[in-house]
Design a protein with these regions (language model features):
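Short cysteine clusters
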Residues: 45, 64-67
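Glycine/small-residue-rich loop that forms an oxyanion/phosphate-binding "nest" at active or ligand-binding sites
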Residues: 82
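N-terminal pre-ligand scaffold of iron-sulfur
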Residues: 1-59, 72-73, 77, 85-103
């Protein structure tokens, strides 16, 4: 059963076209904002373990800062390697608090 965890406050969320890392215990989650919507996904690139929350948004893709792998921030799909999809997590905002649901 998924656990709803607070990752921060609304004021800490990334600006449009940016990504940011959030620590939840020993786990780090990437939150990206694209077209006014926030997406939460695994922070680790499956290629070499790059920190996706330190990446940039180019067009509609989140780009890993280490080797340029590109991810759809909503689905976690990798453009050139669909078998390397990363996990995404439901994100909700309640008043000023931001939560993700992690199984």
């Amino acid at each position: 059963m998924p656990e709803k965890l607070r990752i921060g406050s609304r004021s800490e969320l990334p600006a449009e076209g940016e990504a940011r890392e959030f620590e939840i215990g020993e786990r780090v989650v990437c939150v990206a904002r694209l077209h006014g919507e926030y997406s939460a996904l695994d922070n680790v690139c499956p290629h070499r373990g790059g920190p996706l929350g330190q990446g940039v948004i180019e067009g509609d893709k989140l780009v890993c800062p280490w080797h340029g792998w590109q991810f759809d921030p909503k689905t976690g799909a990798v453009g050139h390697a669909p078998d390397q999809c990363i996990s995404t997590y439901p994100l909700t905002i309640e008043d000023e608090d931001v939560f993700v649901e992690i199984a």
